[in-house]
Amino acid sequence: PSLSHNERFIDLFNATVANVPSQIALAQRTADDSWQTITYADLKRQADSAAQWFLEHGADAQTPIMVNSHNSIEHAIIRHAALTIGAPYVPVSEGYALLGAADDYQRLRFVLGLIKPGFIFAQSEHAQEAVLACAPTAQLICADSAIDASFIPLANVINTPVTDELARATERLTADDVTAYMLTSGSTGNPKAVLHTNRMMCQAVAQQKWMMEGTGLW
């Protein structure tokens, strides 16, 4: 697809889906060391359903969607759902959950106060425990088994029927809308949130394409 800096990132994703719908988009290892995969078409379908669910529960540009998860297919679904509707996506290191219990999750609490997410996806049980302790008023989503009734299983979210509301929400997106808050390491203090926009993300993709020209990898 064209990589004009005026495009929205979701346009690039949707163009790829249209070009290679049955191609594997992501693969991850399962507990038995086999591969779990998802095609571009299925990734879009599930992300669109999740985006519809977020819209129906009040998501917009003022309600960031935080993800406390490792790199995973589930993480990608939430990320693309956020990009589809213009709700800022905020990935948070699982280390905040794994290592934070000893100090009452101080770093996670700081980030929650900074970002004020309307929704939080927690993949592991450790992540669920952390966000439940620190953000009980946010709308909580989990990948598999929920440790508490407060969590909504992702399986429910990705089966939401899509309506015309989703297309209207995507149509309103612009190149300069904020797509993500990326957190700094906080090595010299507390983490800071760095804004990313659609324009910035498209430029980053264009730079990668330029670097790979002539390699046969793009």
Regions found by a protein language model. Give the residues of each.
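Conserved AMP-binding/adenylate-forming core of the ANL superfamily
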Residues: 22-77, 97-106, 156-162, 196-199
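Hydrophobic alpha-helical segments in the ANL/AMP-binding
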Residues: 55, 73-93, 208-209
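Conserved pre-ATP/AMP-binding loop-to-beta segment of ANL
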Residues: 21-24, 142-143, 156-183, 190, ...
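Short beta-strand elements of ligand-binding domains
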Residues: 69, 138-148
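Conserved AMP-binding A3 loop
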Residues: 37-41, 171-172, 179-206
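A short N-terminal helical cap/helix-turn-helix that marks the beginning
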Residues: 3-27, 45
